[in-house]
């Protein structure tokens, strides 16, 4: 008997991007609250930078997985 079984659904690998996306969203919202209460907008900008970098790197990984590993279709 084979110990390998195919699943009817796609099992994803572990990824740091959901965690960094959540951190970026939390930082953005915290920065907006800080900015709306008459403070500077540095935390808001930091959150946006984290979110933009996360989105870029996450889609880079999706593109690589689809191109080199055949895991995603376009």
UniProtKB/Swiss-Prot annotation:
Membrane topology recorded in Swiss-Prot or TrEMBL: Multi-pass membrane protein
Entry keyword annotation includes DNA damage: no
Alphabetized PANTHER family for the sequence: CYTOCHROME C OXIDASE SUBUNIT 3 (PTHR11403:SF7), CYTOCHROME C OXIDASE SUBUNIT III (PTHR11403)
Cellular component terms per the entry's GO annotation: mitochondrial inner membrane
UniProt GO molecular function: cytochrome-c oxidase activity
Gene designation per UniProt: mt:CoIII
Xref: Pfam families: COX3
Assigned protein family: Belongs to the cytochrome c oxidase subunit 3 family.
EC number: 7.1.1.9
Gene Ontology terms: biological process: mitochondrial electron transport, cytochrome c to oxygen
Enzyme class: translocase
Function in brief: Component of the cytochrome c oxidase, the last enzyme in the mitochondrial electron transport chain which drives oxidative phosphorylation. The respiratory chain contains 3 multisubunit complexes succinate dehydrogenase (complex II, CII), ubiquinol-cytochrome c oxidoreductase (cytochrome b-c1 complex, complex III, CIII) and cytochrome c oxidase (complex IV, CIV), that cooperate to transfer electrons derived from NADH and succinate to molecular oxygen, creating an electrochemical gradient over the inner membrane that drives transmembrane transport and the ATP synthase.
Alphabetical keyword list: Membrane, Mitochondrion, Mitochondrion inner membrane, Translocase, Transmembrane, Transmembrane helix
InterPro entries: Cyt_c/ubiquinol_Oxase_su3 (IPR024791), Cyt_c_oxidase-like_su3 (IPR000298), Cyt_c_oxidase_su3-like_sf (IPR035973)
Protein's name according to its UniProt entry: Cytochrome c oxidase subunit 3
Chain segments annotated as transmembrane: 15-37, 42-59
Oligomer and partners: Component of the cytochrome c oxidase (complex IV, CIV), a multisubunit enzyme composed of a catalytic core of 3 subunits and several supernumerary subunits. The complex exists as a monomer or a dimer and forms supercomplexes (SCs) in the inner mitochondrial membrane with ubiquinol-cytochrome c oxidoreductase (cytochrome b-c1 complex, complex III, CIII).
Originating species: Drosophila simulans (Fruit fly)
PROSITE patterns in UniProt: COX3
Reaction catalysed by this enzyme: 4 Fe(II)-[cytochrome c] + O2 + 8 H(+)(in) = 4 Fe(III)-[cytochrome c] + 2 H2O + 4 H(+)(out)
Subcellular location: Mitochondrion inner membrane
């Amino acid at each position: 008997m084979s110990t390998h079984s195919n699943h009817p659904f796609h099992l994803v690998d572990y990824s740091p991007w959901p965690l960094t996306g959540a951190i970026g969203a939390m930082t953005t919202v915290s920065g907006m609250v800080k900015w709306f209460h008459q403070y500077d907008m540095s935390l808001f900008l930091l959150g946006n930078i984290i979110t933009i970098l996360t989105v870029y790197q996450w889609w880079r990984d999706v593109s690589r997985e689809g191109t080199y590993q055949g895991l995603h279709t376009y």
